[in-house]
Amino acid sequence: PVKSVRLVLASFTLADTGDVNATSARLAGGIDRDEGLSMGIGMVLDRTGIPMTYHVTSASPSAEEVSALVASAKNNFGAKRVIVVAGRTPHARDIVEALAESGDGFVFFRPLETAGFDLQAWVADASDYITTQSGSYKVKSRTDEMAGIRVKDTVLWGRDYAKIARKNGRIEDDQRDPALDGYICISSSETKLTAGTLFHIYRELWRLTEPFQLLESDFSPSPYPVAHAIHMRAHFLVCYVAFFALRLLRSDMNWSRNAAQVADALLRMEGSHLAENWFLFSYRSPVTDEIEQAAGVDVARRLRTAADIKRDIAKARKHIERQGE
């Protein structure tokens, strides 16, 4: 049993996969035609960020669907409380009310373009912000009420975020307020947590999305008649296994590298056959050194025999087993 877990909700939209007989199979498995190839993931993480399980969801899960996922996490892992982390969702208010009723919590993205005047004015007000020495970031918090529940609003401004927002600002977006460019606002039931801790929890959403995006390019058409839903569920299973392995490895590396850096290094760590029983591992970087150190094998060894490779794999397996004890 665990004291609490986090349920991170994310949605993904993939281009048409070109599956054989895809048109007639599009609705099989519960995918709405209007949603196209949009699906969601509900991933349960422990307090250290290691995945425990995942569920395929609709792209915008309802309060009832989220409540079912929360109940499943409690039943399967003995969690006393579940913190739901989610980005933009049209069902935020209903989900908040359901979580409050079950005694669970949330960290939700709060879109400023549709927020009330009070919240927008508070965000735009320059007072009470804590600014970094470089001036690149500033943050402030307040307690407020959402759906009759006491919440903590936390807003972060970043200079880089502002540049991106202005670059991506659409001319036809009459509702967009340039004064709010660069601001990210989240609301949470966890009023006792610091602003830094809340944004660290919210970043789980970005961390979950990153490895799945890395693998979307590998989503190739099936040569057999198959429903899109079935194909995508298989794709998400592969993504989850890769995500789980990356998380374990990055945990052993003390989270010193992001998923993209580790995945790229692993792809480059190939051995080329030289002659007879010798293989050359020519690629080396600070990231590969950290990976080998975390796996418990010799660092930066360029020449290996087949026996050396098998021995290193066995050493890495034993090292991982010891780490999990």
What is the predicted role of each segment?
Residues 1-325:
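Anion-binding and metal-coordination hotspots
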